[in-house]
């Protein structure tokens, strides 16, 4: 819907932790860099001079060695950044753009693991892009075109159906998500 000129479906915005499964875990799981049982150190990635440990987790603590499964379930910032750095922020960027069809990411995003790891993108991503990515995970790794709903001036809903499916290679990620 459009609210005061802002289209919540098509305008890019910052999604933060909601992008971790898509920007960090999906690419690394998909190519075998990590598995659900891989151990990741839940410990600050670096000490920012004058600011302390970075990143911090929402619960303000650290678990030490933990599995990808736990890191994803607990939305651990430290682990997301570590996975993104080991996979590579440029590779994560390419995965999101080439496999998932994200169009609002910038080259600057591809150079910053903190941004890619925690969802603080240069411009942001759209609700349409996020919905399509999560739908592919839920659909065993197959992405369908977006089916927007339009409302005509007389109030009738018009569904624009997309045709065909494109495999995006999320079968491993989809299987992991089904375990939840």
Task: Describe each model-derived feature in a short phrase.
Residues 1-2, 150:
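A short, well-structured edge-of-sheet supersecondary motif
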Residues 12, 18, 103-159:
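Active-site-proximal helix/loop microenvironment
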Residues 1, 29-31, 76-78, 123, ...:
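Short, glycine-/Ser/Thr-/acidic-enriched flexible segments
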Residues 14-40, 71, 133-137:
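Active-site SXXK
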Residues 34-92, 139, 143, 155-180:
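Conserved catalytic neighborhood of penicillin-recognizing serine enzymes
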Residues 19-24, 76-79, 126-130:
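Catalytic-loop motifs flanking and including active-site residues across diverse enzymes
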Residues 88-105:
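Short, charged, amphipathic alpha-helices and their helix-cap/turn boundaries
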Residues 2-14:
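A short, polar/charged loop-to-alpha-helix boundary motif
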């Amino acid at each position: 819907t459009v609210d005061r000129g802002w289209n919540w479906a098509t305008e890019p915005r910052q999604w933060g932790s909601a992008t971790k499964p898509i920007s960090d875990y999906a690419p690394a799981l998909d190519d075998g860099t990590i598995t659900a049982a891989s151990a990741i150190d839940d410990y600050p990635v670096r000490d920012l001079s004058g600011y302390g440990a970075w990143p911090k987790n929402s619960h303000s603590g650290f678990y030490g060695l933990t599995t990808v499964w736990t890191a994803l379930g607990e939305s651990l910032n430290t682990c997301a950044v570590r996975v993104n750095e080991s996979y590579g922020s440029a590779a994560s960027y390419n995965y999101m753009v080439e496999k998932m069809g994200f169009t609002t990411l910038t080259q600057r995003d591809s150079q910053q693991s903190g941004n890619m790891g925690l969802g603080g993108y240069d411009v942001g991503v759209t609700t349409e892009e996020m919905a399509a990515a999560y739908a592919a995970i839920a659909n065993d790794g197959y992405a369908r075109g977006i089916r927007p709903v339009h409302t005509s001036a007389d109030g009738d809903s018009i569904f624009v159906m997309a045709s065909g499916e494109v495999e995006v290679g999320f079968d491993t990620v989809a299987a992991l998500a089904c375990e939840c």
